Amino acid sequence: MDEIDNIILHSLRQIECNLDEEVISLDDLSPSMLVQVVSKCISLIDPGLELPRTLPPGMAQRFTATASLAEACRTIGYRRDIGYQTFLYSNVAEVRRVLMFLVEKLPKEAADKTSGSGQPVDSATQLENRILSSLQSQLQAPWMPEFCQVGRPEGLSTTSGGESPAQIAFRRFIPRKISVPFVTQGDVAAEVKEFWSRRNLDCLDEGSLVPSLIAANDGAIKTNAKGAIDEVDRQVKLPAINEKLLQYYSKGGTKHRLAEPSGAAASSGTTEKVVLNNITVETKPGKTPLESLQEEIDALQQEIVQHSEEGVQLESSRKETDESIEEYRKTIVRLKEEKKIKERTHILLEDPEVNVKKLEAIIAAGGERMKKLQDQWDAHRIPLVDTLEAYRLKNSDKLSKSQQVLDQIESTRQKCEEVVIDLQTKGAMYARLQKEFEKLNKTVSRTAYTSRILEIIGNIRKQKNGIDQILQDTRSLQKEINNITGQLDRQFTVTDDLIFRNAKKDEHSKRAYKLLVTLHSDCEELIKLVQETGAIKREVRDLEDQIENEKGRNTAANLAQITHDLTEMQNESQRLEESIRRMEVTSRQ
């Protein structure tokens, strides 16, 4: 038990229960410490329960708090007897059962903490934990198409969040800030403008060039500086920019032209052309190339939305088609089964007389075969049944002998218990005499000691002889009972056989046979009553032993504590009544 207590206390300390170093066993747990420990464990098992963390000072509050703890223990599955007395007037065995139950019910995190806390984690374990967490996060993330993941900024969530497919596809439109401090000023030299334009445009990659230009032009329009980027486009004639734009439009995957040339506009000369080497963008009067690009982007967005809706409709129609195909398959299978049945029926109906005779012959052959199988089964079953009956008879004889042996063992056990009780009595007497001997004067003569020892030895020898005589008488009595029982059984068997033979011819013999059977049943009932009486006596002895064990507990100390608590409660009640009276008097005044 000390080892179990150490394990329980170690587990409680690992879950951060405030236990003093002086607490080395469960006997050292006071009611307040026990309440704190149980409350901590229950809060870890079920955090939703509201429980008192400490034991209140008042007796009424103590009873309420401990009763709530007992109810919480029953709520989480404790099936033994528990109440406020378990915490206020605790018994070590009950406390051990409660704490063992709570430690076993602790959640996995707390159990891991109790088993592995304080151990350093090596780098390999840390790496495995990081890999595990990364894989778990990737597995929990929803799947996204590949084209929706291109150009996604770092840290952007992979969930769609209810966005349309067009919005997901156009996430790659990521503009960057273009810093052109004084390119648009009139007094700046062309070489300086070219230098700053080249430097700023070379800082951009092919994916963010066009979005950056569009965003910068839009900002210039908002700040009443319309045409700032257009002037740069007109003045800067760089092969690098042309190559980047060509690569962008060739890799962008779009097959649409930026703007279709209009014949009427070309003939009338109402269109304006902005040329960057090999790239030509025709714009309508009053519109910039950025606006034309924006219109093209809007058109592409509408097409993407339209294609997405068409894809959803096609998917729904595909599902409906799959369902109809499955129904058709089931119908085909059912029709094939019906076709087989009808074909067989048609074959039978082609020549009914011959087919009926064939069926009758098959049925007759099956009946004969069944009869042969039944005969074979009976031929195998009857010997096995006889063998089984013989084994049952042998088993019943063995059971009767086993019962006799069990009765002998039980009687021997009772005698051993009596001897043990007698030995305990003698041990108590020996302890008492030992204490008396220690209290005696050391100057007692050797003769008194010798006579006392001889007297004790004589008494012990007499008691031993008496016990041996009782055991011998019991053994002889048991042997006589067994012999008489065997003789009675044999005599009853012989008498039953003789009277049964004459009972068929003589009426008196028949009556004597009935009386013999009644006598035998009465004797068996009497034996059963004697056995039940012995069992009741054994139960009485067990109950007496339990009473002695209960007397050995600290019942007196618990009663004294209960009396003390009752006195405190009465004093508290009196103080409360006095305070209520004072408050009433104050309110009346």
Swiss-Prot record:
Residues covered by region (Disordered): 568-589
Organism: Aedes aegypti
Taxonomic placement: Eukaryota, Metazoa, Ecdysozoa, Arthropoda, Hexapoda
The protein's name: Coiled-coil domain-containing protein 22 homolog
Biological process, per Gene Ontology: positive regulation of ubiquitin-dependent protein catabolic process
Highest taxon of the lineage: Eukaryota
Annotated InterPro entries: CCDC22, CCDC22_CC, CCDC22_N
Family recorded in the similarity comment: Belongs to the CCDC22 family.
Signal peptide: none
Coiled-coil boundaries: 287-426, 523-589
Keywords of the record: Coiled coil
UniProt feature, compositional bias: Basic and acidic residues: 574-589
GO MF annotation, one: cullin family protein binding
